[in-house]
Amino acid sequence: TLSSSSAASDVYKRQDFDPFWQYLEDNKIPFMLHIGPGTKTQPSKFRNNGRERAADLHGGGENLRFPDFMCLWYAPQEFLTAMVYDGVFQRFPDLRGGVIESGAGWVPEFLRMLDHGWYSFNKTDQYLKDMDLMPSEYIKRAVRFTPFPNEDVGHMIRDSAPELYLFSSDYPHPEGTKDPYGKFEASLEGFDEEVKDMFYRTNYDHMMFRKSEALAEAAE
């Protein structure tokens, strides 16, 4: 599991870190970005508002609050943008990873903005010119995301691609809700079994470098 903070990203994208990515690729080990010390929270200057700080999610003192929740995806976006722009995913086409417990509703627009940026700057940016895929295609190939159960994963799939998302309950933490499976099933209404199987099983297998059995075999 890697820190996705800006300082860490400056290290991971440098070519002298390539032996690490080569090791992960050769040994079929996925990298993981997870909420934690490297996660961006609301800058402290915004908390200087003259109000008493609210209790955290679990009723204690040092955990997640609403303003921090709204910043969860900033660090993964910065990290993945650096990995794309600095050519890590291009140099290591079999590298895989996951973004865990940072939500996923932001992913479709993030992919659009990556490609929008490419169209806007590729005529003058030699690094964009050298890419052998569109920026969003590197993400689709390499990275998987876990939506929160209260997010509309069906909408995300329609708005991007079914291979991007995978089931996660975060059990036993309360943000997984009492019935994550039921919530995801309601969101996936109308999708065929192949797409559901990708969400519940084969997208995880891909991320973990595992070979997926056919759906019929897996059900036996």
Write out the residue ranges for each language-model feature:
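Alpha-helical scaffolding segments of alpha/beta enzyme cores, especially the outer helices
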Residues: 19-26, 87, 186
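Active-site gating loops and adjacent loop-to-helix segments of metal-dependent hydrolytic enzymes
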Residues: 39-71, 117-139
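Mid-to-C-terminal alpha-helical segments outside catalytic/metal-binding sites
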Residues: 86-87, 95, 106, 124, ...
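Single conserved hydrophobic/aromatic residue that forms the stacking wall/gate
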Residues: 1-8, 12
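C-terminal active-site-proximal or functional interface alpha/beta core segments in diverse enzymes
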Residues: 57, 70, 74-78, 108
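Charged helix-capping and loop-helix junction motifs
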Residues: 13-19
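Active-site beta-loop-alpha junctions enriched in small/polar residues
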Residues: 9, 29, 34-38, 102-105, ...
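Short, well-ordered coil/turn segments that N-cap beta-strands
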Residues: 27-29, 93-96, 135-143, 163-165
